[in-house]
Regions:
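Short, small-residue-biased leader/transition segments that mark boundaries at the very start
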Residues: 1-4, 8-15
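Glycoside hydrolase catalytic-domain context in secreted enzymes
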Residues: 11-228
């Protein structure tokens, strides 16, 4: 939806029936919806693993943050994924500024996940750390609960080196296991969604609904001489 904040907010709010309210599902999540990529993740594509996006406070508040705010406050998404790039000098997957907005300002209670291999980018592409252990420290210290990639395999090494406060690990574990409990993964198939048979997957009525959604979601703009 480009940079149109209203379209962004409208589309992301549609995930509200997956959120934490639990009003008609016994308190269980149907799925753990994730909002991504936080934040100012708009390219350039070829440079996204090392790019530093500069956005002033006005642009952040009016353009880049409203959709995420709607996801957190209205849709109550369970997860937020950090972007590959830096925003105003801070890597998005370990940004104190973005975490302050997300948790302190908006009240986000779910877990934060890195984009795939984004934490490896800290030392390989952004060059803001020198080693995987330093990257792990930076990410955990700044609220990245789970790493899509393999860099968190260095957590134990970082602990042995005295680089990591184990309280950071405990905090992340609480968030991650909270999501699993909300999904009913420890409740022995007692959630309302366990009764849905596998035959519902790609059944005719669902395929038709997906086709209808795609067909009716297309917008064709008429050229009234604006373009050559």
């Amino acid at each position: 939806y480009g940079d149109h904040r209203d379209l962004h907010s409208f589309s992301t709010r549609r995930s509200s029936d997956l959120g934490r309210d639990g009003s008609d599902n016994g308190g269980y999540l149907r799925a753990a919806a994730c909002a991504k990529h936080f934040a100012v993740h708009s390219g350039p594509e070829a440079l996204r693993h090392s790019f530093d996006a500069q956005a002033d406070p006005k642009d952040m508040e009016e353009t880049y943050l409203p959709a995420f705010e709607a996801c957190v406050k209205e849709a109550k998404v369970e997860a937020v994924m950090g972007a590959y790039n830096r925003t105003n000098g801070e890597v998005c997957c370990a940004s104190p500024s973005l975490q302050k907005i997300l948790r302190a300002k908006w009240g986000f209670e779910g877990h934060f996940v890195s984009d795939c291999w984004a934490i490896r980018d800290f030392h390989e592409n952004h060059k803001i750390t020198a080693t995987p252990e330093e990257s792990v420290k930076l990410a955990l210290e700044n609220g990245c609960d789970i790493n899509c990639g393999c860099t968190y395999q260095k957590i134990l090494d970082a602990v042995k080196l005295g680089m990591i406060d184990e309280a950071w690990i405990n905090e992340s574990c609480v968030r991650l296991f909270t999501t699993r409990y909300l999904l009913g993964l420890f409740d022995d198939e007692k959630t309302p969604y366990d009764a849905i048979p596998f035959t519902e997957v790609e059944c005719e009525k669902n395929l038709e609904l997906a086709h209808r959604a795609a067909r009716e979601g297309i917008v064709l703009l008429k050229n009234d001489g604006v373009l050559p």
